[in-house]
Swiss-Prot record:
Residues 7-38 form the LisH domain. InterPro entries: Coatomer_complex_subunit (IPR050844), Dynein_regulator_LIS1 (IPR017252), G-protein_beta_WD-40_rep (IPR020472), LIS1_N (IPR037190), LisH (IPR006594), WD40/YVTN_repeat-like_dom_sf (IPR015943), WD40_repeat_CS (IPR019775), WD40_repeat_dom_sf (IPR036322). Positively regulates the activity of the minus-end directed microtubule motor protein dynein. May enhance dynein-mediated microtubule sliding by targeting dynein to the microtubule plus end. Required for several dynein- and microtubule-dependent processes. The keyword Cell division applies. This is Lissencephaly-1 homolog 2. WD repeats lie at residues 103-142, 145-184, 187-226, 229-270, 271-327, 330-369, 373-403. HAMAP family: lis1. Dimerization mediated by the LisH domain may be required to activate dynein. GO terms for biological process: cell division; establishment of mitotic spindle orientation; microtubule sliding.
Length: 403
């Protein structure tokens, strides 16, 4: 491979920077012979590129092994040695444990995937945020700054920032490049439960035990709007797919659908018989398939919402009509979190019953159950393509492979 002039200059600058640390004379000779230009370059760039190459090499080896296995299965299928049936779909969706990440000293409340790099963030009751390489399972960095439990974290769409919510009443914005806190958002009067970035990264939505939801402007750090109608602790608030609306759920057992611009409540959804822990909008491509199955094909009704509750149930709502489409039952204890498979139709849920369950939303059925996925209550889960992450009161994070 031939490097471009720009790539060659950047490489020479990185080598020169590396030599300067311990080999000053060699660095001067190299600078002269390679005609290295003075310029701004990211610290430790050469080491970072080297580590990236090692990680990518491991990933290539893993993918080559998977391709080899799939080719063998394909050859067997073509030879008639494998008969596919309905159970294959169940097998395909079975999570297989890849890594158990240990390092937190208290329960882990939340996990989040970086939108571009192989970084997983975790938030814990020990007051810290940890960053992990989810391909290798290696610990990378601890972010410290909160003085109480860290309840939630989220990456912005560019991957430049990470936002954290804490019981110390604050929201912190961290710059990943330097692992430093660049803003602290103050305004909530009790624990901050969740945070979420808007799709363009301009705004942050937060929910709090002070019974309010706040919309923050990232650039200024100012609170643009406060929504206060819930009667109890707001457990979660999320933007709708088009970001014109939002959904919130609360300890008051209610789910509210809000129009963000006006601050008005569009619908009050009731039906759960205990605290509603989380709400999430179904991806649009999955919502369309579900609505087609439900014979509700109006293109305007693509904002489907999933809610999970301590009443052990998962409910799916049409937020345009304000109606409950169906309810999924099966968990034996509080349901704490859900995440969607890339196909948009399958969903995974986690619970205090220590199980992971896989659901088909079109069929409204449970397809798979993983018993004792953690030693204690499982609090949250997230999916990034075909990597599934869970976190638990047992102080660990687990990474699972999905096909």
């Amino acid at each position: 491979m031939v490097l471009t002039a720009r790539q060659r200059d950047e490489l020479n600058q990185a080598i020169h920077q590396y030599l300067l640390i311990s080999y000053q004379q060699s660095a001067q000779v190299f600078k002269t012979e390679a005609v290295v230009k003075d310029g701004q370059i990211e610290a430790d760039l050469l080491e970072k590129k080297w580590n990236s190459i090692v990680r990518l090499s491991k990933r290539v080896i893993t993918l080559e092994q998977q391709v080899e296995q799939l080719n063998e299965q394909l050859a067997q299928a073509q030879a008639g040695k494998i008969q596919f049936n309905k159970s294959d779909d169940e097998q395909r969706l079975t999570p297989f444990e890849k890594f158990k990440l240990e390092g937190h000293r208290a329960g882990v409340n939340c996990v989040a995937f970086h939108p571009q790099y192989q970084i997983l963030g975790s938030a814990s009751d020990d007051g810290s945020i940890k960053l992990w390489d989810y391909e290798s399972g290696h610990f990378e960095k601890t972010l410290k700054g909160h003085t109480s439990n860290v309840n939630c974290l989220a990456f912005d769409p560019t991957g430049k920032y990470i936002c954290s919510a804490s019981s110390d009443l604050s929201i912190k914005l961290w710059e990943l490049k330097n692992h430093t806190c660049v803003k602290t958002l103050i305004g909530h009067e009790h624990s901050v439960s969740t945070v979420q970035f808007s799709d363009h990264g301009d705004f942050i939505l937060s929910a709090s035990r002070d019974k309010s939801i706040k919309l923050w402007e990232v650039q200024t750090g100012f609170c643009k709007k406060t929504f206060s109608e819930h009667q109890e602790w707001v457990r979660c608030a999320v933007f709708s797919n088009d970001e014109k609306q939002m959904a919130s759920c609360s300890q008051d057992q209610m789910i509210y659908i809000w129009v963000i611009d006006s601050g008005q409540i569009l619908h009050q959804l009731s039906g759960h018989e205990h605290v509603v822990e989380q709400v999430k909008y179904v991806p649009e491509h999955g919502a369309k398939q579900i609505l087609t199955q439900q014979q509700q094909q109006n293109i305007q009704t693509i904002n489907l919402l999933v809610s999970v509750s301590r009443d052990k149930e998962i409910k799916i709502w049409n937020t345009i009509l304000g109606t409950n489409l169906f309810t999924l039952s099966g968990h034996d204890n509080w349901v704490n979190g859900v995440s969607f498979h890339p196909d948009g139709v399958h969903m995974l849920s986690v619970s205090d019953d220590k199980t992971i369950r896989v659901w088909n939303l079109k069929e409204q059925k449970q397809k798979k159950k993983i018993e004792n996925a953690h030693d204690k209550f499982i609090l949250k889960c997230e999916i990034n393509k075909f990597i599934f992450a869970t976190c638990s009161v047992d102080q660990t994070i687990k990474l699972w492979l999905l096909s």
